[in-house]
């Protein structure tokens, strides 16, 4: 577990971008313009938020083992666990994230958003980045639960290339 637990969510001045998907355009190849959201606003407007970081859209572990769990359990998270938002964070651009979300079967972003963290700024601020080259950073594989503005769970995988343990939806469910 991280030293972020039991502390106020570290929103700072960080923002993310995502592209909304609705039932009417879920099967279309059209693309909308990205929306920019301040982390502080998202956290203040929602009582319970799950945030999970993934190294790369369309990568094998992210696409097969990590993110599908959140999509498969979304109804349970929202209806039974009263989660307001699930945010999937990568450093990929919002267009790639939207295409990835659609490829995973997301048809509505009311409760799940695929967020772009430009320059890995937010992820680096919480210490969950993954150095992949000379000054190049991706998001590590991690998960966080924020309830009423307080971090109640935060953990990062030690081997983000293959492991999906502390960042899995099952691990998050155990901490709700």
Curated annotation (Swiss-Prot):
The keyword Acetylation applies. The modification Cysteine persulfide is found at residues 62, 120. Keywords: Acetylation, Antioxidant, Cytoplasm, Disulfide bond, Isopeptide bond, Oxidoreductase, Peroxidase, Phosphoprotein, Redox-active center, Ubl conjugation. Residues 9-176 form the Thioredoxin domain. There is a cross-link at residue 156 (Glycyl lysine isopeptide (Lys-Gly) (interchain with G-Cter in SUMO)). Changing residue 32 to R: Prevents urmylation of AHP1. Pfam families: Redoxin. The keyword Iron does not apply. Thiol-specific peroxidase that catalyzes the reduction of hydrogen peroxide and organic hydroperoxides to water and alcohols, respectively. Plays a role in cell protection against oxidative stress by detoxifying peroxides and as sensor of hydrogen peroxide-mediated signaling events. Preferentially eliminates organic peroxides rather than hydrogen peroxide. Relays alkyl hydroperoxides as a signal to the transcription factor CAD1/YAP2 by inducing the formation of intramolecular disulfide bonds in CAD1, which causes its nuclear accumulation and activation. Involved in cellular Mn(2+) homeostasis. Homodimer; disulfide-linked, upon oxidation. This is Peroxiredoxin AHP1. It comes from Saccharomyces cerevisiae (strain ATCC 204508 / S288c) (Baker's yeast). The gene is AHP1.
